[in-house]
Amino acid sequence: MNNTEQLFRYAPKLKQLSEQVLFADVWQRPLLSPRERSLITLAALAALGRTEQLPFHLTLAEKNSLTKEELGELFTHLAFYAGWPAAVSSLSRIEPQE
């Protein structure tokens, strides 16, 4: 059981909302592609310093056709808006995905 599954044991409603609202509804809306949603989500997580959530979303971004080079460019661009530490901390999460 991974860490997210362990947390959802204590908050089954949060799991239900994540699955049924966030991923089955919000992520499926047609005006933004899954690729664009991945970019937006990664930028938000990085800017807010939510690096614990990055591994899941980096894997999802790769499934949504983002390359490691594009992810590197995302975090490079973000450094100027969210700060160097946020960008470097986020960038360091790319490698463990291999």
Model regions and ranges:
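Short, structured motif recognition centered on aromatic/hydrophobic residues
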Residues: 37-45, 74-75
